[in-house]
Design a protein with these regions (language model features):
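Conserved active-site motif detector
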Residues: 2-131
Length: 131
């Protein structure tokens, strides 16, 4: 899935924390499979991860394979990357200082490493919303 800036801004806005009186609106930027699952720590951590877990997004502008690389970590452990075909808009937002959040949306036992984990990325659009 390739998202350009306009497509990214036309996606769904949701509330980050329904229990909170003041929340910031979030923009769903993308839903992607995890790239590189078989090369990093995902296999060893599989039994500990759960759908809904928070993921850390780490921008790697000096990555020799892809200058738009965005690494995906879980509790300080490297799991892989946002796929190269999906990382342009996210890298641009992160380079401009936008706050991005990610969470696991799917965990599936599969021989195909591209089907093992999916995640969503949200941008904090910085607007507090009163409930």
């Amino acid at each position: 899935m390739r998202l350009d800036l306009i497509a990214a801004l036309s996606l769904v806005v949701f509330f980050a924390s329904p229990a909170s009186a003041d929340t910031n609106a979030k923009l769903l930027l993308q839903n992607s499979p995890l790239a590189g699952f078989r090369y990093y720590e995902g296999k060893q951590l599989w039994s500990e991860m759960k759908v809904g877990d928070t993921l850390q997004l780490v921008r790697e502008p000096d990555n020799s394979h892809d200058p738009k690389a965005v690494r995906i970590d879980w509790q300080g452990h490297k799991l892989g990357y946002v796929p190269r075909t999906d990382n342009k808009a996210l890298a641009r937002f992160m380079d401009q200082g936008s706050k991005a959040e990610a969470r696991i949306t799917r965990l599936k036992k599969s021989r195909n490493p591209w089907q093992r984990m999916e995640f969503e990325v949200y941008l904090d659009i910085g607007q507090p919303i009163q409930k």
